[in-house]
């Protein structure tokens, strides 16, 4: 405590807190050293220990008694106060760290390389190839879809054809009827026998078939068709007769009211038989007038 009081009471000239004492600046200005070489070397290969030594940095000294620190520790304040004056290992470590991002920048994905026209020209064909591949894949996909649809349609058609074939197999096969053509002589003889007999026995049918050089089935079928035709003709004739009879019944018969013979006979009978005189009636009941009616004699009118 007494030591500190003595120091505070000391004159201001001996105070260690002056700027002059802190910076330890000399009264005479030192000659400026060439800094261009050091800056060039720093830009080219980074800072080195020898180049840093050329710079004149002021030392910041503090009194040992003020902070109760040893003097040999404070002498090295310039080393830990300025980080770039540390050991060579730290300097090398920093240069390695700074070199790594440079290597990254030198990679082909740097901004300058990206902006180069060669890479742009290279990337354009790649993009075109990618687009061509996409179009090719799209075309393939559409073709595959079309093929799948066509395959599905073909399978459906095949299934329908199989079903149709099965249905045809199930249905009984109907053979087309063979139509026999008869000659005029055969038709005439068949018609004449049909006029005589509508139905033939088995023996008659066999004899007729032998005479006409036909089979019994052909003769049998011809007679069946002829009988059907004959029945249709009879039905048509009956319908025509019924229609005519119905039309005759629809005619209204009007009775005859006057005959000439009956009128002459009636006139002669009237001449022989006296005709009764009718009475002329009037609305008044008490007055009656009798007047004879003369039919044959005309009335005489005065001139």
UniProtKB/Swiss-Prot annotation:
The keyword RNA-binding does not apply. Residues 175-234 bind DNA. InterPro entries: HD, HD_metazoa, HMX_Homeobox_TF, Homeobox_CS, Homeodomain-like_sf. PROSITE patterns: HOMEOBOX_1, HOMEOBOX_2. This is Homeobox protein HMX3-A. It is found in: Nucleus. Gene3D superfamilies: Homeodomain-like (1.10.10.60). Transcription factor involved in specification of neuronal cell types and which is required for inner ear and hypothalamus development. Binds to the 5'-CAAGTG-3' core sequence. Belongs to the HMX homeobox family. Expressed in the ear placode and vesicle and in cells forming the vestibulo-acoustic ganglion. One of its GO terms (cellular component) is nucleus. CDD domains: homeodomain. SUPFAM superfamilies: Homeodomain-like. Pfam families: Homeodomain. PANTHER family: HOMEOBOX PROTEIN HMX, HOMEOBOX PROTEIN HMX3. Keywords: Developmental protein, Differentiation, DNA-binding, Homeobox, Neurogenesis, Nucleus, Transcription, Transcription regulation. Residues 112-126, 153-171 have a biased composition (Basic and acidic residues). Residues 95-176 are annotated as: Disordered. One of its GO terms (molecular function) is DNA-binding transcription factor activity, RNA polymerase II-specific. GO terms for biological process: cell differentiation; nervous system development; regulation of transcription by RNA polymerase II.
């Amino acid at each position: 405590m007494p030591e500190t009081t003595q120091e505070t009471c000391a004159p201001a000239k001996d105070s260690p807190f002056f700027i002059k004492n802190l910076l330890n600046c000399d009264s005479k200005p030192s000659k400026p050293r060439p800094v261009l070489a050091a800056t060039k070397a720093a830009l080219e290969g980074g800072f080195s220990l020898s180049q840093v030594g050329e710079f004149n940095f002021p030392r910041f000294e503090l009194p040992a008694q003020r902070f109760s620190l040893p003097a040999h520790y404070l002498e090295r304040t310039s080393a830990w106060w300025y980080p770039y004056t540390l050991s060579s290992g730290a300097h090398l470590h920093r240069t390695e760290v700074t070199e790594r991002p440079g290597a990254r920048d030198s990679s082909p994905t740097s901004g300058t390389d990206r902006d180069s026209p060669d890479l742009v020209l290279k990337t354009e064909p790649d993009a075109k190839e990618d687009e061509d591949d996409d179009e090719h894949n799209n075309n393939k996909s559409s073709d595959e879809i079309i093929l799948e649809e066509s395959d599905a349609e073909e399978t459906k058609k095949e299934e329908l054809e199989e079903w149709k074939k099965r249905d045809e197999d199930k249905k009984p096969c109907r053979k087309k009827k063979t139509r026999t053509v008869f000659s005029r002589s055969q038709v005439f003889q068949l018609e004449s026998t049909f006029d005589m007999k509508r139905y033939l026995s088995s023996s008659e049918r066999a004899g007729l078939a032998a005479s006409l050089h036909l089979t019994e089935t052909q003769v049998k079928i011809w007679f069946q068709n002829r009988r059907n035709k004959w029945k249709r003709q009879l039905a048509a004739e009956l319908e025509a007769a019924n229609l005519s009879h119905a039309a005759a019944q629809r005619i209204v018969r009007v009775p005859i009211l006057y005959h000439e013979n009956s009128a002459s006979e009636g006139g002669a009978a009237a001449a022989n038989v006296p005709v009764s005189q009718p009475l002329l009636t009037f609305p008044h009941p008490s007055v009656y007038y009798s007047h004879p009616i003369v039919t044959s004699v005309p009335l005489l009118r005065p001139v």
